[in-house]
């Protein structure tokens, strides 16, 4: 495969001149290349520190840190000036580079000429003889010089004769010559033969016509010379064509910190740009569009708006939003979904939108979404009722470790709905009339037996669940309770001691 013949691999570089007779052109080409993009200058702009860069390159650099990429001096976009002379030089070098490089890479070919193939008066033979030169010097070596001088004299005489013949055969000297009026849109005055516009002939005859056709006929009218287009347009011609074209207006920069998201999206919409994405992406998109647009204003051949939009899209997919390109093309899919959703929204907002056809087409999808939403609500309701039932039932089913058992029992005792004995008869309040202790009433004023003591102990364990410290605290509070006066039956009875029984 011819690698050098493929344009994808044949990237022009200044090192292409190495190994050729024109290796001295390598620094010349390096001087014509930008220090940022390493390509030929495209609309070169001169900074305030006298450095030159491409218009797009320097504007991107200044939009980041407002400093020159070479000397790191502070600069602004408003101080950039176009270097048009360098632009003309770069264009001329780019147009002639391919031809010069092919000429430098082509080896010189010398054709050998045999004596019998050329006559004695052949100029190529004389040229070859002069290039080779005599090997031995002799007195007759000066003859070619005299013959050369005589040849030059004869050539000069022949040239003079040709010029004289041309002068003798001019149309003015030919009696049969008929003057043809030039096709320039003008007419000649019938008296003085002065050429002018047809509308000016009558006024010329009344005011400024000399009125002597003999004197006017003696001098030959000089036709108006129309400028002929040159195959090599000069700098002045290009400058005139540039000044005739009205340059596009530049876009001003925005203070993004002073704009809300709605205002920024409105600015992008006015410029015909996309409005989807985060706040950071919107700012970067607007800033890059301003850079592309203002750099295009500096170009001698501005691009179309469609080309600039294509460049912006390429920048956003490669540089502007690199996070979307990660993950094996997931970002591109996200951009596609976002663009599709945006197009769908615009379609729905259209006043000619067919709602019935849309409902018929996507009714099944909406029904599935509604069904899923209802099932989710029902599931959440059932889960909430189950949690409430578990809470009312004491949270059965949960495994509690031994270390958490005392704390859990104390919490259950505090929040239990069953009243305790202390809640029924507080220690500091006297009992109501006719109220008797359940244990004492059960034994009819007699000392309780072992069965009664066991039942009382079981009842205390049920009423006040918890640790032995909690039970001991309850017994102490019962012992410290003062006797109730006026109740002989209760005052005569003693509380049984479980240790003695």
Curated annotation (Swiss-Prot):
Annotated EC: 2.3.2.27
Record family assignment: Belongs to the RAD18 family.
Family matches, as InterPro entries: Rad18, Rad18_fungi, Rad18_UBZ4, SAP_dom, Znf_RING, Znf_RING/FYVE/PHD, Znf_RING_CS
Its job: E3 RING-finger protein, member of the UBC2/RAD6 epistasis group. Associates to the E2 ubiquitin conjugating enzyme mus-8/ubc2 to form the mus-8/ubc2-uvs-2/rad18 ubiquitin ligase complex involved in postreplicative repair (PRR) of damaged DNA.
Region (Disordered) residue spans: 111-154, 203-250, 377-501
Protein name (database record): Postreplication repair E3 ubiquitin-protein ligase rad18
Native species: Neurospora crassa (strain ATCC 24698 / 74-OR23-1A / CBS 708.71 / DSM 1257 / FGSC 987)
Segments forming UBZ4-type zinc fingers: 186-214
Main subcellular localisation: nucleus
Superkingdom, natural source: Eukaryota
Location of the protein in the cell: Nucleus
Gene symbol of the encoding locus: uvs-2
Residues noted as binding Zn(2+) in the record, renumbered to the chain: 189, 192, 204, 209
Record field: compositional bias (Basic and acidic residues): 127-142
């Amino acid at each position: 495969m011819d690698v050098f013949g493929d344009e994808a691999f044949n990237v022009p570089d200044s090192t292409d001149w190495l190994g050729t007779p024109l290796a001295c052109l390598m620094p010349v080409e390096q001087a014509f290349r930008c220090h940022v993009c390493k390509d030929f200058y495209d609309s070169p702009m001169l900074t305030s520190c006298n450095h030159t860069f491409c218009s797009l390159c320097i504007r991107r650099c200044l939009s980041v840190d407002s400093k020159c990429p070479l000397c790191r001096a502070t600069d602004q976009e408003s101080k950039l000036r176009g270097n048009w002379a360098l632009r003309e030089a770069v264009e001329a070098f780019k147009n002639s580079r391919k031809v010069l490089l092919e000429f430098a890479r082509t080896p010189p070919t010398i054709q050998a000429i045999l004596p019998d193939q050329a006559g004695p008066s052949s100029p190529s033979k004389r040229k070859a003889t002069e290039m080779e030169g005599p090997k031995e010097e002799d007195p007759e070596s000066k003859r070619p010089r005299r013959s050369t001088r005589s040849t030059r004299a004869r050539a000069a005489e022949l040239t003079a004769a040709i010029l004289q013949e041309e002068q003798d055969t001019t149309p003015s000297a030919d009696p049969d010559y008929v003057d043809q009026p030039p096709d320039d849109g003008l007419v000649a005055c019938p008296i003085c033969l002065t050429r002018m516009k047809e509308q000016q002939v009558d006024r010329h005859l009344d005011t400024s016509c000399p009125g002597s056709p003999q004197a006017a006929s003696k001098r030959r009218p000089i036709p108006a010379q129309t400028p002929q287009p040159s195959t090599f347009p000069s700098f002045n011609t290009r400058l005139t064509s540039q000044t005739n074209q009205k340059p596009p207006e530049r876009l001003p920069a925005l203070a993004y910190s002073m704009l809300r998201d709605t205002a920024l999206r409105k600015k992008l919409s006015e410029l015909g740009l996309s409005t989807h994405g985060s706040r950071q992406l919107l700012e970067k998109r607007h800033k890059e569009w301003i850079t592309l647009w203002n750099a295009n204003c500096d170009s001698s051949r501005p691009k179309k708006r469609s080309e600039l939009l294509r460049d912006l899209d390429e920048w956003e997919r490669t540089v502007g939003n690199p996070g979307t390109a990660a993950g094996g093309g997931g970002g591109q899919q996200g951009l596609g979904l976002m663009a599709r959703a945006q197009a769908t929204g615009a379609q729905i907002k259209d006043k000619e939108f067919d709602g019935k056809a849309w409902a018929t087409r996507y009714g099944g999808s909406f029904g599935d979404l509604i069904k899923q939403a209802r099932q989710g609500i029902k599931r959440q309701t059932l889960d909430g009722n189950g949690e409430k039932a578990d809470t009312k039932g004491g949270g059965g089913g949960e495994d509690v470790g031994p270390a958490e058992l005392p704390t859990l029992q104390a919490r259950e005792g505090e929040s239990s709905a069953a009243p305790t004995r202390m809640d029924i008869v507080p220690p500091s309040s006297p009992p109501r009339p006719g109220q008797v202790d359940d244990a004492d009433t059960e034994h009819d004023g007699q000392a309780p037996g072992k069965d009664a003591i066991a039942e009382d102990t079981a009842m205390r364990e049920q009423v006040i669940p918890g640790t032995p410290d909690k039970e001991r605290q309850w017994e102490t509070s019962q012992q410290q309770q003062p006797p109730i006066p006026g109740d002989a039956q209760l005052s005569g009875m003693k509380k049984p001691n479980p240790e003695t029984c």
